[in-house]
Amino acid sequence: MPARQSFKDLKDLILCDIGNTRIHFAQNYQLFSSAKEDLKRLGIQKEIFYISVNEENEKALLNCYPNAKNIAGFFHLETDYIGLGIDRQMACLAVVNGVIVDAGSAITIDLVKEGKHLGGCILPGLAQYVHAYKKSAKILEQPFKALDSLEVLPKNTRDAVNYGMILSIISCIQHLAKDQKIYLCGGDAKYLSAFLPHSVCKERLVFDGMEIALKKAGILECK
């Protein structure tokens, strides 16, 4: 397919975000995901535009859909950050002013002001926290338990482990965000949003950034 071919509408193509564990898709405004072993069963007929943070999963996609196009070079995000992941770049591209929290296998926090990425940090994801506690001491090998509030101090080890985990994440987000709007995406976004009253869950945030990138490249027509 020629690089300059353009599409009139999102429904004419499929966006793909290749992560470390799952491969996520957006077809028009419908979201779905797949393990790499199940890609062929999807039977995708439309043109695929993708980003990737995992080489093995990217190869799996290309084995099934060899005409899929990597859009990493289709846009420019203003930033001084060296080595910013393509998924973080796309999420930042979708926000003009605010704090972007991607709560996936790792939790990334990025600040954007007037369209420029100012910097960010990376925390372990919830599963990584649980694994770290398990490695630290037998008594800290506690199952994850969703908390309703951080207002009451825990009275047992299981709650204390989960409390410390969530408080460290929320405190970091609040420290960086101050009075800025917080946008959350990723698998644990909805859970974390309960502790951030002025936040907004945007499960399509990375795909919104991809849509903007394609429009800037002239591949998707602006509306």
Swiss-Prot record:
Homodimer. A monovalent cation. Ammonium or potassium. This is Type III pantothenate kinase. One of its GO terms (cellular component) is cytoplasm. Pathway: Cofactor biosynthesis; coenzyme A biosynthesis; CoA from (R)-pantothenate: step 1/5. Belongs to the type III pantothenate kinase family. Its cofactor is NH4(+); K(+). Keywords: ATP-binding, Coenzyme A biosynthesis, Cytoplasm, Kinase, Metal-binding, Nucleotide-binding, Potassium, Transferase. It comes from the Bacteria. PANTHER family: TYPE III PANTOTHENATE KINASE. The gene is coaX. It is found in: Cytoplasm. Its EC number is 2.7.1.33.
